[in-house]
Amino acid sequence: MAALISNIGGTIIMSLFLFQSDVRKKAKKLLGLIKKKQFALWQLLGGVAGAVYISTASSTVSVIGTGLFTVVLVASQNVSGILVDKFGFSSGKRKKITSKRLFAMLIGTFAVILTVSEFEGEILWIPIIAVVFAGLAVTLQFTLNARVTKYSNSQVSAFINFPMSMFAVTLTLIVMNLFGKNWNNWPDQWWLYSAGFLGAIVVYLAAATVRTLGVLLFGLATVAGQLVTSIILDVLMPNANVNVGFAMLFGAGLMLFAVYLASDLR
């Protein structure tokens, strides 16, 4: 249900861009390319890949825990991201697998291992494999949306993402209902409904920057932002289950260093 709410909100937010004449022109241009078969329809399925990630997250986090989920997801994103950049699948400039980028990928993964909570209990391989595919789905979402951006613009790409994702999530919920799974639980907290707005920002930024930054750098920067924000929130709103200690701070610092390495700054 959270995924559906997020996609509805994102669709509404991104629909506002259609009031801009330039966005409508770009959308018509893309439609023309599709009609001429100069742009394959499957490249519009970035939102479906995003829905795969959301559905996998909602069904595996409670089984393997947030810590292990995050580590496996980030590792999968990093490996797939560096390969996508290598072969230029996002329609951006190809980026060689240099020792610096490889080191950044490894540091980024290690940083997440440091900052997440320790995993306790039996390792369940089926959910872990599912999370690996979820990481691949996130990379695929960024890649496909970047390809749409190349032939239109980031607003059109982000707008297409949400209806596609909403369709996939709705279909998943219908199937769950057929198998007797109850999903009709609406959140009580009003602020949870802001997820669609925040998701729209992330998808838009990804569509606008991935072709330039590359999938690896965008992924590392996104995780770095999440880690820093989570530390700030944990300090401002302390949680008994979370300890902002040396490991978490050092891990966040390592992640920022990984972003620096991947950015090729001198």
Feature-to-residue mapping (PLM):
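Transmembrane alpha-helices of multi-pass small-molecule transport proteins
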Residues: 1-49, 107, 137-139, 158-178, ...
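Glycine-/small-residue-enriched transmembrane alpha-helix faces in small-molecule transporters
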Residues: 1, 52, 56, 103, ...
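Helix-helix packing/entry segments at the starts of transmembrane helices
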Residues: 67-76, 149-164, 200-234
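Loop-to-transmembrane-helix transition segments
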Residues: 27-52, 126-132, 182-201
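Membrane-interface helix termini and inter-helical loops of multi-pass transporters
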Residues: 1, 28-30, 59-60, 113-126, ...
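Alpha-helical transmembrane segments of compact multi-pass small-molecule transporters, enriched
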Residues: 9-12, 72-87, 164-171, 221-237, ...
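Juxtamembrane helix-loop boundary signature in multi-pass membrane transporters
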Residues: 82-133, 243, 249-266
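Structural signature of hydrophobic alpha-helical transmembrane segments
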Residues: 1-12, 59-79, 123-137, 184-199, ...
